[in-house]
Regions:
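Aromatic-residue-lined binding/catalytic grooves and analogous aromatic/hydrophobic interfacial grooves
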Residues: 48, 154, 169-171, 330-337, ...
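Extracytoplasmic/secreted proteins, especially bacterial periplasmic and envelope-associated proteins
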Residues: 60-63, 67, 71, 157-164, ...
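Bacterial Sec-dependent N-terminal signal peptides
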Residues: 1-28
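Feature activates predominantly on carbohydrate-active enzymes
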Residues: 119-306, 324, 381-384, 396-413, ...
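Gly/Pro-rich turn-and-neighbor structural signature
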Residues: 82-84, 182-190, 256, 263, ...
Length: 542
């Protein structure tokens, strides 16, 4: 076994820590020690303050602000008041406004700041999911003094800015799902030279909850949602919150027959809308329909497009109609029930291509019928997974605006990337990537061991060939894949902050953020050894 000298290890560690600080220091604006010129949020004398956020704000922003109030309580044992009017009693009378939060497209306070030229509209107007964090003096009438401003280009931009403040005061995105401890602080200060976030690298970034039979579903049924006995709105609320704290925006819900289908519980979609999550469905669920548990062959007839086309289209049309008021990415698909091929193996390939093209055309027509927008502007995705990839490769024609989501081989290696012709498509491309898998030849469900270096290599190749529209990670039932989910979503948010060198230290840095930099060298040794061993042979295969 090769031994690395202590001197070499120290130099490497210093390099890694320098890199880690470089990645984070640019946007660090919260401190726990008073410095000259800092804005006081919490001190021994200042034990209360207010957050100003207009009632007109998006529901998702108000939800995030309420969570921010609770985050301050976790850290400093104070719960800031929330006021919606600069002249509201309590805002300038005792409970001073110290934080102003608003979206460029909704907040009257942000519009006032732009009008008074205290905020540069060029950084926000027309931008996707960007935020600005800075300090402003006398921001609006009725609010004297200096405040911390969090302004977003749109609702999710504002939400990400809010949760960035939560992260910097010490609340991990995984505080609930992984019980990451929150360190208490008696003082909180802000020094915020203007921080402007990047536009996310990938437009829709999220996870697909899958194979929930052994973990997520029984846990929800027996502990968190006993009254429902299944995965329901309370569980999905916690998942939506986690995604937003990780700067994601997209969710494909659990779909095995063991759990109640997402849209069979009306509150579920209301929860997603309240959090501002864009819903979708997996590669085998057309137009948000969970065919595995929602299609009843006894009452609806066979799930066979060749034999039962009219009924299939009727059910799919109803699903679009029921959900057209919400943000969705619509999957275009025609597969058998529960991740199986449709039709017999003796069907000629030309007939398979013709049938799939016809089904996708019908689905597009249903979208156009029920949504009052040009169909070309509505997010749609097609995933050539398993046998569908062969059909696609045999000449399947897709509308140019549909996003092709390229799958991996279930083990982290991309099966295909966009070629020169596909790179010209207006719908661009996406990625469907496994960090958990149930199927042949081998499953891996205990916990995720996909190497970060492999993830970066494969996802970067995909991104560089126009896969920047949708990234969806199959994360199983979430638990056991926390690090890989974080890495996947961090790369989807800012792929250019990663390279082949710094991605290998990601697990150690990820753990150090939670438990302290003093343990970094220990984490680096453990994670690198663990990843190398598990790459040789996954624990599930022993």
């Amino acid at each position: 076994m090769m031994r690395i000298s202590l001197k070499t290890r120290i130099v490497c560690l210093q390099l890694c820590l320098t890199l880690a600080s470089t990645l984070q220091a640019a946007d660090k604006f919260v401190s726990f020690i008073r410095e000259e010129g800092t804005l006081e949020l919490v001190t021994s004398q200042q034990r209360s303050f207010s957050i100003l956020c207009a009632d007109e704000e998006h529901k998702g922003v108000l939800t995030a602000v309420h969570n921010l109030q609770e985050d301050f309580y976790k850290v400093a044992d104070i719960r800031p008041a929330l006021v919606a009017d600069a002249k509201q009693k309590g805002s300038a009378d005792g409970q001073n406004v110290r934080i102003l939060i608003g979206s460029f497209d909704e907040s009257p306070f942000i519009k006032q700041l732009v009008k008074s030229k205290k905020l540069d509209a060029r950084e926000l107007k027309g931008k996707n999911e960007k935020f600005i964090i800075t300090t402003v003096k006398d921001p609006v009438e009725g609010i004297p003094g200096e405040v911390l401003l969090i302004a977003g280009s749109d609702k999710r931009g504002t939400i990400y800015g809010v949760y960035e403040l939560s992260r910097q005061i010490g609340v991990s995105p995984w505080y609930w799902w992984a019980d990451v401890p929150v360190k208490k602080h008696k003082t909180l200060y802000v020094d915020a030279p203007t921080t402007v976030s990047k536009t996310p690298s990938v437009k829709y970034r999220g996870v697909f909850l899958n194979d929930e039979d052994w973990g997520l579903k029984p846990w929800a049924a027996k502990t968190f949602e006993k009254e429902r006995g299944n995965i329901g709105p309370r569980t999905y609320a916690k998942i939506c919150e986690l995604l937003l704290r990780l700067k994601a925006n997209h969710l494909a819900p659990a779909m095995h027959p063991v759990s109640t289908a997402f849209y069979k519980i009306p509150e579920n979609k209301l929860v997603a809308d309240t959090f501002a999550i864009v819903m979708g469905s997996s590669h085998c669920e057309p137009l948000l329909l969970n065919t595995a548990s929602e299609w009843n062959s006894k009452t609806m007839g066979p799930w066979d497009y060749g034999k039962n086309k009219d009924k299939i289209n009727e059910v799919l049309g109803n699903r679009v109609k029921e959900n057209c008021a919400y943000e969705n990415v619509y999957t275009l698909a025609l597969r058998g029930l529960h991740d199986a091929a449709m039709g017999g193996g003796d069907v000629p390939m030309k007939e398979k291509v013709k049938m799939l093209e016809s089904a996708l055309k019908d689905q597009r027509n249903l979208i156009a019928e029920h949504i009052d927008r040009p169909v070309e502007t509505i997010p749609q995705a097609f995933t050539p997974y398993k046998e569908v990839l062969e059909i696609y490769s045999n000449g399947l024609e897709l509308p140019d605006d549909v996003t092709i989501i390229w799958p991996d081989d279930n083990f982290g290696y991309m099966k295909r990337l966009s070629g020169p012709h596909e790179q010209k498509r207006s719908g661009r491309a996406g990625v469907y990537y496994h960090v958990s898998y149930l199927g042949v030849p081998h499953s891996y469900l205990w916990y995720s061991t996909t190497p970060p270096a492999l993830m970066y290599e494969e996802l970067r190749k995909a991104y560089d060939t126009t896969a920047d529209r949708i990234w969806l990670a199959n994360c199983g039932d979430l638990k056991g894949a926390e690090m890989q989910v974080s890495l996947f979503l961090d790369m989807a948010y800012d792929i250019d902050s990663f390279n082949a060198n710094n991605v290998v230290t990601y697990p150690a840095r990820w753990l150090a953020k939670m438990f302290g930099d003093q343990y970094y060298s220990v984490f680096e040794d453990i994670t690198s050894s663990h990843i190398n061993l598990a790459f040789s042979r996954k624990p599930e295969y022993m």
